[in-house]
Amino acid sequence: MTWIITSDQVNPPGDAAITYGITNAGGVFNLRSTGTVDYEIEWGDGNVEISTVNVLPHTYTAGNYDLVVYSDGVYRPSFNNVTADASQITSVVIGSGANLGTDLAGAWSGATNMTSFVCAFDVTSGVTNLSSTWRSTSFTDFPELDFSSAITFNRAWFGSRIENFPPNMFDTTGTLSSAAFTFSWINARLSAQSIENILVSLDTNGATGITLSINGGTNANTSTWSAAANAAWLSLDAKGWNITQNGPDPT
């Protein structure tokens, strides 16, 4: 790709990998990634950098900014519960051209002020590790993503505000480990419909002997579950799943 400088942009318009919205009180924001990277960052205040650094600092005056990350290669976000930086993130948009690699463990963990997460469906098709990826985030509607290679979702939505989760998300995955869903939705806010969607999809998957955590927080109590959710729970139980939820076990 040939990069042409036009105004504050080195890359041509439209090929952004990730756009972050942040709110900065006046001070430093560190853009965090992991692994080998080579990217351009438009800081949203007229400054542009090209970098191969995993922790790249930038100093702002107080305000709201849109940061745009461009990369032709693998670029793996990794805020990993570093509160000073993760808590500044208010939104994430990931375009269809992004290459997130295979490991998104802790990518946006601790982004407690992230109220919007938008991601192209196929961007996650090669990701295997989603441990703690959206832990403690604040957006309520989870997008439809391709989890066909994923093998672990341990703590993926732990303590998040996720309420609405799409159907069929786990129909096809990689070979799940026995702890693949341990603590995954503890202290979240899943609706009864979302729990139905999750359980039915996991039952469709066919995996056996796995621990699943959908308890705590305001996750819907079994007293509000649908017949389809109850049936899926019972089917998973018969397949050796160890499921913890709010309310008594379905019968």
Model segments located where?
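Short acidic/polar micro-motifs centered on Gly/Asp/Asn
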Residues: 32-63
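Extracellular and analogous surface-interaction loops
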Residues: 11-25, 57-62, 81-84
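Structural signature of tandem-repeat unit edges
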Residues: 67-70, 84-102, 112-128, 137-151, ...
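Membrane-proximal C-terminal cap and juxtamembrane stalk of leucine-rich repeat ectodomains
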Residues: 196, 207-251
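Short acidic/polar inter-strand loop motif in beta-rich domains
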Residues: 72-80
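Periodic small-residue-enriched repeat registers in elongated scaffold domains
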Residues: 107-108, 133-134, 156-157, 184-185
